[in-house]
């Protein structure tokens, strides 16, 4: 300690004098005998005390003041020598005061050795500091130039492009035609039914039944059906190479009228010659009886055929294995036909007959007839290209936008929220089969839309273009231009004198699409060479080759070859992919537009900010480079480059001193002084004194000073909070929430995606899907179930209540007569209903089995009664007296005689002759009356005047003839006499 004091109090201190005059009482100095700590400001000042004493005062003060200063310094140094040694670095307090420290000077520093005692001055300095509770602090060494960087030069900003070649127009979308080709056909056949019945003694049974259909000959169709509306009862058919004949009812051939069927399906009409099936049963039992029924049937049904139209089906269930477009013309001979040539017949100018109205058609047609083993089919022939089409119209689009993107066209249709993608090359309709209808329908639909909506505002800029989109949709598109844009084009053409190029300017894609395919060369395209004398051999060869090419083309059907090479367009059953494509394109366009605008704006802003960075780095290179690298660095400009060093994070404690005044009374620190340790748990000897920089940066030196000013107020960021100094003295901590924030950021205003609803669309309706098959099975099933009811015993199946119809007619008649007539009609209908009900009841009773038995018994009883009546009548005719008056018989006479005591052998001489004569007269009179009644009835029946006159005369004669009949007495005189 003495040596330290002597070294300090040597010649070095002899010339020292203070810089600021008298020391202030609140300034604390810590003279230390030992070597000062590294980085200590007091130690550095004491170490340079000799220099301070040797340096003359700038104000040129007298030597007497210097001597006083030297004496005061010696006293201070002498006092410090007698103090015990203390650590050079103060230990941090256990607690961080928020204001001026009020701790006792008797606190013992735990970092001191047991033999050491704390320095009160150092404890005062230490306890007057503020510990940083949170936040990261960094210390940055000065850059030396070992690491240099430069600022990137300006970039080229991208330019955003919405698309290329946007074109608006009208379009018609076609889809695959899955519906069959439908037409009407007539079916002619004779239904033959051969029945075999066994006749027993008391029963009849059906032992066999043969049913077959045979075709009607074409000659019979011409001569009878379509000429007279009749059909023959004879049927000829070939079975097992044998010609068979059948006759209706097993009788001779006759012509029968064709009558409408009583029961027909909605999609067909039918006519036949009979409704009943003949079943003959003879009178002789124990035999088989065979009968034949021939029913001539004509049906008008619906026929269907699907691509490639090599056959067609009828609603009767029959399939004809020939194309409906087959014919004898040149273009129709190539169609498919599986039947022999003699089975087919085509008639030009044919006029069929309507079997309902019995009238022939006014316009002649071309009729085809095909005879199959069971039926003859006829239909009207039409050209294939006119009737059949493999594509059908799906949607008419009145607003469509086409844009070119990455070598493809995108057709956007907002009305159905769909986007279709196709190649930029137009689709040739000739490459697909049977597409002649597309161009016609597309042109008509586009012209109709244009006249309704765009005729006054737009003009067409090209012809109809065809594109095959993904999914099998054919788009017929015709581009348009608004009138204003068309005028601009015309003005540009007139200005550049290119009026001949108007079409190419309005539609620049027309030439590209039309010239994309190279025309194939052929010998047919070479003109026929003319032989010359100079090159006869060469010309002959060319002539021969040309002729072979023509013959090959003529011999091989061009349509058939083309049909093999053509490919049918297949369309998907859903357009969900197109709707998703529309949604994706919509989102993609919006997002890409926003991102591209952001990228362009960001790049432009970066280029502008780069200039600002380049200028600001000259002012504060460390802050600029740290913000650029997003890392704490220390920087220094070295010409056109920047030298940097990386900052180290302070892991130890940082203490902020509560005073910003330096030892000079006129000089103060511009940033607060701090004391810190690099690592944690460091002792007092490892503490470093520095100065607080910006953004929690710690300087290892205290070089930031300024002249002291009055009413000074400063806020400094210390950790995560701010500290407030007033007049270079710490006042309090300030939370960040008490300080209002001003934002330097530019808000990015982005537009949200607009709502887009997906519309449910059906490419094929349920009716179309149900109608795709070759056969309508519901129609076939209905027809087959009703076939028997349609032609056989229809009267026993279809019961029509004629009584109800008659009653309804009578009721309508009486109802038209007014209220009185309606009342009378009610009574009449009630009575008639009772009668009808009675008759219906009797009929129902007769149809009942018990009723039939009762009727049989009644018939037998009637026969017995008739037999006895017949015997009685015969008895009257043979012996009327005996029959009418049995008392006159011989038995009665004998009985009477016996009663009077006479024998049977006695004669009848005692019989009363008068009574007998009266009886004879009575019988005679009765016979005359009977004859007279018969004569009168005949006269009345014949309405003959002569007979009536004769009858009246006979009546007069009978009235005047003879005495009148007198009644016999009840008692016999003989009996009376006997009783007396």
Swiss-Prot record:
Keyword line: Disulfide bond, Glycoprotein, Host cell membrane, Host endosome, Host Golgi apparatus, Host membrane, Host-virus interaction, Membrane, Signal, Transmembrane, Transmembrane helix, Viral attachment to host cell, Viral envelope protein, Virion, Virus entry into host cell
What segment(s) does the record annotate as region Hydrophobic membrane proximal region? Answer: 794-847, 823-843
- Per the annotation, the residue ranges of the short sequence motif Golgi targeting are 925-928
The residue ranges crossing the membrane are 850-870
Glycosylation site positions: 165, 275, 380, 423, 497, 514-515, 560, 727, 749
CC annotations in GO: host cell endosome membrane; host cell Golgi membrane; host cell plasma membrane; membrane; viral envelope; virion membrane
Question: Which biological process terms from the Gene Ontology are attached to this UniProt entry?
Answer: symbiont entry into host cell; virion attachment to host cell
**Disulfide pattern:** 140-647, 157-603, 231-296, 389-437, 668-708
What is its biological role?
Envelope glycoprotein that forms spikes at the surface of virion envelope. Essential for the initial attachment to heparan sulfate moieties of the host cell surface proteoglycans. Involved in fusion of viral and cellular membranes leading to virus entry into the host cell. Following initial binding to its host receptors, membrane fusion is mediated by the fusion machinery composed at least of gB and the heterodimer gH/gL. May be involved in the fusion between the virion envelope and the outer nuclear membrane during virion egress.
Name of the protein: Envelope glycoprotein B
Q: Which organism is it from?
A: Equine herpesvirus 1 (strain AB1) (EHV-1)
């Amino acid at each position: 300690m003495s040596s330290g004091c002597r070294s300090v109090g040597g010649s070095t201190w002899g010339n020292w004098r203070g810089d600021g005059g008298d020391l202030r009482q609140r300034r604390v100095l810590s003279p230390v005998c030992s070597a000062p700590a590294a980085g200590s400001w007091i130690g550095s000042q004491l170490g340079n005390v000799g220099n301070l004493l040797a340096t003359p005062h700038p104000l040129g003060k007298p030597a007497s003041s210097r001597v006083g200063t030297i004496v005061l310094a010696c006293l201070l140094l002498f006092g410090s020598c007698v103090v015990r040694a203390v650590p050079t670095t103060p230990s941090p307090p256990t607690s961080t005061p928020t204001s001026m420290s009020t701790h006792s000077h008797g606190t013992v520093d735990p970092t001191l050795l047991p033999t050491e005692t704390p320095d009160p001055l150092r404890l005062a300095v230490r306890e007057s500091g503020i510990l940083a509770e949170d936040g990261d602090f960094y210390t940055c060494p000065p850059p030396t130039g070992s690491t240099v960087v430069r600022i990137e030069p300006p970039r080229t900003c991208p330019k955003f492009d919405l698309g290329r070649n946007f074109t608006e127009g009208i379009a018609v979308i076609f889809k695959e035609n899955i519906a069959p080709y439908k037409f009407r056909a007539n079916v002619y056949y004779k239904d033959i039914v051969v029945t075999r019945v066994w006749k027993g003694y008391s029963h009849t049974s059906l032992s066999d039944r043969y049913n077959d259909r045979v075709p009607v000959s074409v000659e019979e169709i011409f001569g009878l059906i379509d000429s007279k509306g009749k059909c023959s009862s004879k049927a000829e058919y070939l079975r097992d190479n044998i010609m068979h004949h059948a006759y209706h009812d097993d009788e001779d051939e006759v012509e029968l009228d064709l009558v409408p069927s009583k029961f027909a399906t909605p999609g067909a009409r039918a006519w036949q010659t009979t409704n009943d099936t003949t079943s003959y049963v003879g009178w002789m039992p124990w035999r088989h009886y065979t009968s034949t029924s021939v029913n001539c049937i004509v049906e008008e049904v619906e026929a269907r055929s699907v691509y490639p139209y090599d056959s067609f089906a009828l609603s009767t269930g029959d399939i004809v294995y020939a194309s409906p477009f087959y014919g004898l013309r040149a273009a129709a001979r190539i169609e498919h036909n599986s039947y022999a040539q003699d089975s087919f017949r085509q008639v030009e100018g044919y006029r069929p007959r309507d079997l309902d109205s019995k009238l022939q058609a006014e316009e002649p047609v071309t009729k085809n007839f095909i005879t199959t083993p069971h039926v003859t089919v006829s239909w009207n022939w039409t050209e294939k290209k006119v009737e059949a089409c493999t594509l059908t119209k799906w949607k008419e689009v009145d607003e469509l936008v086409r844009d070119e993107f990455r070598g493809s066209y995108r057709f956007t249709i907002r009305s159905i929220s769909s986007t279709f993608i196709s190649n930029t090359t137009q689709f040739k309709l000739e490459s697909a089969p049977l597409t002649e209808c597309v161009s016609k329908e597309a042109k008509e639909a586009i012209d109709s839309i244009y006249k309704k909506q765009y005729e006054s505002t737009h003009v067409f800029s090209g012809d109809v273009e065809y594109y095959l989109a993904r999914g099998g949709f054919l788009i017929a598109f015709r581009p348009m231009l608004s009138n204003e844009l068309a005028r601009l084009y015309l003005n540009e053409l007139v200005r550049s004198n290119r009026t001949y190029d108007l079409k190419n300017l309005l539609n620049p894609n027309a030439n590209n699409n039309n010239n994309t395919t190279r025309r194939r060369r052929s010998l047919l395209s070479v003109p026929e060479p003319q032989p010359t004398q100079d090159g006869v051999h060469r010309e002959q060869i060319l002539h021969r080759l040309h002729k072979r090419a023509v013959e090959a083309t003529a011999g091989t059907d061009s349509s058939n070859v083309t049909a093999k090479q053509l490919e049918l367009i297949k369309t998907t059953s859903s357009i969900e992919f197109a709707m998703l494509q529309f949604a994706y394109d919509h989102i993609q366009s919006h997002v890409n537009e926003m991102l591209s605008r952001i990228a362009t704006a960001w790049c432009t802003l970066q280029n502008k900010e780069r200039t600002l960075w380049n200028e600001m780095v000259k002012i504060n290179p460390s802050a600029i480079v740290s913000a650029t690298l997003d890392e704490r660095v220390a920087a220094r400009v070295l010409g056109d480059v920047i030298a940097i060093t990386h900052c180290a994070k302070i892991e130890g404690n940082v203490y902020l001193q509560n005073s910003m005044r330096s030892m000079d009374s006129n000089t103060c620190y511009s940033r607060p002084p701090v004391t810190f340790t690099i690592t944690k748990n460091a002792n007092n000897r490892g503490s470093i004194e520095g100065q607080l920089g910006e953004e929690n940066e710690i300087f290892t030196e205290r070089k930031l000073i300024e002249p002291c000013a009055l009413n000074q107020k400063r806020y400094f960021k210390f950790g995560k909070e701010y500290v407030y100094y007033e007049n270079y003295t710490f006042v309090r901590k300030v939370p960040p929430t008490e300080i209002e924030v001003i934002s330097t950021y530019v808000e990015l205003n982005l537009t949200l995606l607009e709502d887009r609803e997906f519309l449910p669309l059906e490419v094929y309706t349920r009716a179309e899907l149900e109608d795709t098959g070759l056969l309508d099975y519901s129609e076939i099933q209905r027809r087959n179930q009703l076939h028997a009811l349609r032609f056989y015993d229809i009267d026993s199946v279809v019961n029509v209540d004629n009584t109800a119809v008659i009653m309804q007619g009578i009721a309508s008649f009486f109802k038209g007569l007014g209220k009185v007539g309606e009342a009378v009609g009610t009574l009449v209908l009630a009575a008639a209903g009772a009668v009808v009900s009675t008759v219906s009841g009797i009929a129902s009773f007769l149809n009942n089995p018990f009723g039939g038995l009762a009727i049989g018994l009644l018939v037998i009883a009637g026969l017995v009664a008739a037999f006895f009546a017949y015997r009685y009548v015969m008895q009257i005719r043979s012996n009327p007296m005996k029959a009418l008056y049995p008392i006159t018989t011989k038995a009665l006479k004998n009985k009477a005689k016996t009663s009077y005591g006479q024998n049977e052998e006695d004669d009848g001489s005692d019989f009363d002759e008068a009574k007998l004569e009266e009886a004879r007269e009575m019988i005679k009179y009765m016979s005359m009356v009977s004859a007279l009644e018969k004569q009168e009835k005949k006269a009345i029946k014949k309405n003959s005047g002569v007979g009536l006159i004769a009858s009246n005369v006979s009546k007069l004669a009978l009235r005047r003839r003879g005495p009148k009949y007198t009644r016999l007495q009840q008692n016999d005189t003989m009996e009376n006499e006997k009783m007396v």
